[in-house]
């Protein structure tokens, strides 16, 4: 019976955490003057360059703008994070 009450109770802050992360993302995009179109163009360029060296899973590719803390002063700064699934390495002769 107790599990039934848990089911209908609040989600222990999960929604709050998601909302906070979304707000952070909106603020980063606003502060860096970065539009969704810019991120899409950046993604296309990254795909072009990386595709010369590896075969990638473009569907699983994720690029986002976030914040990180600098090592030397712990100040938050914008960071470009790319998750690029690699299918296989390409053979290249030099």
Curated annotation (Swiss-Prot):
Transmembrane segments: none annotated. It comes from the Bacteria. One of its GO terms (biological process) is cell division. InterPro entries: MinE, MinE_sf. SUPFAM superfamilies: Cell division protein MinE topological specificity domain (SSF55229). The keyword Cell division applies. Keywords: Cell cycle, Cell division. HAMAP family: MinE (MF_00262). Prevents the cell division inhibition by proteins MinC and MinD at internal division sites while permitting inhibition at polar sites. This ensures cell division at the proper site by restricting the formation of a division septum at the midpoint of the long axis of the cell. Belongs to the MinE family. This is Cell division topological specificity factor. It comes from Alkaliphilus metalliredigens (strain QYMF). The gene is minE.
């Amino acid at each position: 019976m107790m599990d039934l009450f848990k089911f209908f109770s609040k989600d222990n802050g999960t929604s709050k955490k998601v909302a906070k992360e979304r707000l952070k993302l909106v603020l980063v995009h606003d502060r860096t003057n970065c539009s969704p179109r810019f991120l899409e163009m950046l993604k296309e360029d990254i795909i072009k360059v990386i595709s010369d060296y590896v075969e990638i899973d473009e569907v699983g590719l994720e690029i986002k703008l976030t914040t990180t803390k600098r090592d030397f002063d712990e100040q938050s700064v914008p960071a470009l994070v790319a998750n690029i699934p690699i299918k296989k390495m390409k053979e290249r002769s030099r």
